[in-house]
Amino acid sequence: MAGNFSEIESQGNISLKFGFLGLGMGGCAIAAECANKETQIKNNKYPYRAILVNTNSQDFNKIEIKNTGNVRKIQLEGYEQGAARNPQVGEEAFVKHETKIFEAVKQEFEDRDFIWITCGLGGGTGTGALLKAIEMLYEHDYNFGLLLTLPRDAEALKVLENATSRIRSIAMNQEAFGSIVLIDNAKLYRKFEEENPSALANEYTSYSNKYIADALHEINLVTSSFTPFSDTHFDASEFAQVINTPGVLSLAKLELKSNQLDTENPLGYLTQLGNALEKGVLYDTEREELESAKKSALSIVTSPLRAGRLYNFSFLNQMENFLKERTPYVDERPIAPYVNKHTTKKEEDIVKFYSVVAGLPLPKRVSDIIDEITRIKEEREQANSKKSNAVLNKLFAFDDSVQEEKPKKKKLNFGAEPEVEVADDSQPAKKKLSF
């Protein structure tokens, strides 16, 4: 989804005014990148606003901010050294400064249509502050959702446990707020590795933050930037309803050339579209998960040259049947064909599909993380037990019960004894000499 959509940015209008409340190092970096998104909209070059909340004072220095006027930093004083991956410290820091944070929310997000709480699950500050931030916005009746990154399996056990602990708490209360957008770091890391095999490891963070920001920004542009081809439309108000739907939200995108869309033989492109839905942009879904969705929408964008030929009754009917098959129980599932009047010559043969599916259950990736935690614990226990047994066996095999033997008393030796003649009974014994 992220990537080449400059022609949208150059002429596009955003559907909703987003505010981003970034928590912790990861959450602040994502929120700042979202606030860095630019448009050519007059008097609204930077359409999003962000509040960055963190403990570690050094983390702010790592974040690039293009326009300081739409980003506010809040340093949680007294916790400048960070939370050391301890969520309890992060929660404590947020509570101590909650009044200051809420004042910033009221000032910065007063005109926002929707607020995203952004957080990298697994650390201390963001993970710890997350539940308190949810409570704060919920109690003051804000429309908000969550933008959360899931850790890779390569992360330490504590990180994985911190993440799943917070997901469990969120799942218990998810009906109280809007959509949850999950970002699978394992998926994005693989994509980064494939696209940039010679890149430095520290470039991934910048790549992933931009990828996330681009994905959300692009779908927010699609719903307000193009000319509807028919009466069926997926407008800003409908988009707002979708992201206010409790549960997990999935975004998907597919680009095809117009000659790949044969309405008389639709199996090929419908299969590709189905795969795109399941792959998603930010995390993978399974078909069974999609079938439990509450809302879905499919937007299609192409050039004026191709729109007149492609958007016939047969094609749109195929799209309706496709989305009905994939999301059979949703409340709404609009199909919205659009014409991009500003398509470049290079892209006039391209057809783009954008899907939004809301109200989904937690994905299999969360289950995979739990399985990884279980595996690590079991292997650690086995390794510790094996090492302990080896030491004990060696210890018990060692005989340290040898009794001390009393040293034998040394015999005195004064040299050879003088020969003594046996006295004859008939003669007196010879007197010994005495010196």
Swiss-Prot record:
**Which transformation does this protein catalyse, written as a reaction?**
GTP + H2O = GDP + phosphate + H(+)
Reported effect, residue 332 to A: About 40% GTPase, decreased polymer formation
PANTHER family for the chain = CELL DIVISION PROTEIN FTSZ-RELATED, MITOCHONDRIAL DIVISION PROTEIN FSZA
Consequence of substituting residue 238 to A: Loss of GTPase, forms polymers twice as efficiently
- Functional note: A tubulin-like, filament forming GTPase; the motor component of the type III plasmid partition system which ensures correct segregation of the pBc10987 plasmid. Binds GTP and forms filaments. The filaments seed from a DNA centromere-like site (tubC)-TubR complex which extends to surround the TubZ filaments. Highly dynamic filaments grow at the plus end and depolymerize at the minus end, a process called treadmilling. TubR-tubC complexes track the depolymerizing minus end of the filament, probably pulling plasmid within the cell.
Enzyme Commission number: 3.6.5.-
| Region called Disordered, residue ranges | 403-435
This chain belongs to which protein, by name? Answer: Tubulin-like protein TubZ
Quote the Pfam families the UniProt record gives: Tubulin (PF00091), TubZ_C (PF21493)
Principal EC category: hydrolase
Superkingdom per UniProt: Bacteria
Does the entry feature the keyword Hydrolase, yes or no? yes
Q: According to the record, what induces this protein's expression?
A: Expression is repressed by upstream TubR (at protein level). Probably part of the tubR-tubZ operon.
GO terms of biological process kind: cell division; plasmid partitioning
Please list the GO terms describing molecular function. Answer: GTP binding; GTPase activity
Subunit (UniProt):
Forms filaments. Filaments bind to TubR. Binds to the TubR-tubC protein DNA complex.
**Free-text comment on this protein's domains from its UniProt entry:** Consists of two domains: a nucleotide-binding N-terminus that hydrolyzes GTP and a C-terminus domain necessary for polymerization. The domains are bridged by a long, central helix. The C-terminus is required for GTP hydrolysis in solution but not in crystals; it plays a role in filament assembly and in binding to TubR. Interactions between the C-terminus and the following monomer drive polymerization.
> Impact of mutating residue 333 to A?
No change in GTPase, no change in filament polymerization
The entry's cellular-component GO terms read: cell division site; cytoplasm
Q: Say yes or no: keyword Cytoplasm present.
A: yes
Record localization: Cytoplasm
* UniProt-annotated binding residues for GTP: 25-26, 124-126, 155, 185, 208-209
